[in-house]
Amino acid sequence: MEILASGQLLFSALVLGATYALIALGLNLVYGTMRLLNVAHGDLVMLGAYVAYWLFTFMTVSPLLSMFLAMVIAAGLGALAYVGIFRRQLAERATAGRLEANSLLLFFGLSVIMQNVASLVFTGSLRAYQYLDEVYIIGGVAMTGNRLVMLLLTISVCVALTLFLRLSIYGLAIKALIQNRDAAAVVGVNVERVQLLSFSLGFGLAGLAGTLISMSKQISPFMGFPFTIAAFIVIILGGLGNIPGGILAGLLLGFLEIYGVALTSPMYRSVLLYGVFVGVLILRPQGLFGLRRIVR
């Protein structure tokens, strides 16, 4: 069992878990405030990855700079989608079940469009670039510069968003909307404005995650689907709409995947992830960190 004490595995688990947490943050913001199931979330990660790739390859712009542009582009796409499509859906005040069903279909269509456009523009070939790929030995653990930067930036963004939600006026408004939309409106929260902010911020975080992932992974037009699945598993584990719970669940999923594969085989990766997912749904459907709702 010496493998469990491996610093190399610990580092890999932290990087993967923090990445899952960051991706799931954006998905959780959109679902928590609006009950919309964004199955195109991973395709926004793909969009951010291609922005970083092309800017670095053709203009030698560092991904640490292009991540801001990727975030703005993805957030702008989110704002357009909200104003053009989802604002009217939300204004109709449909039931949560109907909203989820409608959003599932709409986002699925958006996902197909984004994947096909990316395939036409960038082709389906795998692409990659070398950035901060020097290997450093820290405490006996070998780590590349890009993965170390990725870990530090991902943790920083998660901490910054948590502080934003706890300390800023708009952050508190988002939390109020997550808890109860009607009550938030009664106390003066501009629901439509906060929904637009959450939608744009959720999309932007996915674009940001894509640029960080592109520094150490190959990218393709169809790279987003596994990240979408992982993000949904994370928000189920952490509790739907539970932002801190989602961060903890992302880290937990990263550890389960890395250590589970190390103890078994890479071929069991999907079995491990979906096994945990199904087990939580059966035993604790509100999530590991969610609160049980009592209906009276």
Question: Where would I find each of the regions flagged by the language model?
Answer:
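Pore- or pathway-lining transmembrane helices of multi-pass membrane proteins that form conduits
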Residues: 47, 54, 90-118, 224-236, ...
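Membrane-interfacial amphipathic/re-entrant helices at transmembrane-helix boundaries
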Residues: 1-23, 51, 63-66, 93-104, ...
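Transmembrane helix-bundle core of multi-pass membrane transporters
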Residues: 89, 98-167, 194, 259, ...
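Cytosolic-side transmembrane-helix boundaries in multi-pass membrane proteins
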Residues: 94, 179, 186, 190-193, ...
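Inter-helical junctions in multi-pass inner-membrane proteins, predominant
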Residues: 2-12, 165-169, 196-235, 241, ...
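Alpha-helical transmembrane segments within multi-pass membrane transporters and channels
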Residues: 60-110, 248-253, 257, 284-285
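Helix-loop-helix "hairpin" substructures at the membrane interface of multi-pass membrane proteins
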Residues: 16-17, 142-219, 243-249
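Single transmembrane alpha-helix segments in multi-pass membrane proteins
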Residues: 5-57, 86-98, 239-240
